[in-house]
Curated annotation (Swiss-Prot):
It comes from Colwellia psychrerythraea (strain 34H / ATCC BAA-681) (Vibrio psychroerythus). Involved in the biosynthesis of isopentenyl diphosphate (IPP) and dimethylallyl diphosphate (DMAPP), two major building blocks of isoprenoid compounds. Catalyzes the conversion of 4-diphosphocytidyl-2-C-methyl-D-erythritol 2-phosphate (CDP-ME2P) to 2-C-methyl-D-erythritol 2,4-cyclodiphosphate (ME-CPP) with a corresponding release of cytidine 5-monophosphate (CMP). GO terms for molecular function: 2-C-methyl-D-erythritol 2,4-cyclodiphosphate synthase activity; metal ion binding. This is 2-C-methyl-D-erythritol 2,4-cyclodiphosphate synthase. The record marks H34, T133 as: Transition state stabilizer. Pfam families: YgbB. Signal peptide: none annotated. The gene is ispF.
Amino acid sequence: MRIGHGFDVHKFGGKGPLVLGGVKIPFELGFIAHSDGDVAIHALCDAILGALCLADIGNHFPDTDGQYENISSRILLRHVVSLMTDKGFQLGNADITIVAQAPKMAPHLVAMRTCLSEDLKTTIEQVNVKATTTEKLGYTGRKEGISVHAVVLLIAIEHPLPLIEEIQNI
């Protein structure tokens, strides 16, 4: 078993859409970001990559690489999930905390869990998404942006498929 923690933050700016957990959320602003700015997925990717000791999302999808400009973060998550599987792990569970004063997250949490569980190739019961505020304190309290924490538990697959490098060395 391995545990990983991820964190990300993005500032509001420009026009939407505002995407969180793979779900478009009605709001007057979007995020300032190289990709679609989905901070929930970015934190989740970092948590998985951290548990696998594979650095972080910036190393795998640098914002200096034009191919990732405006890319859906769901594509990035699916790639990270393939790395997890290649390394012989599967998701035990994920717990994601969105810190935002606005917009209200409660109406969208189940949709986020559904979307993320699809990309993680797991059940909705293994993915929790919750939201909180900072009681109007700090940058999230001033509605300047959103931050997200994610924690994952990865479980070793009993009989993982061999990695391509291992097959080539046979």
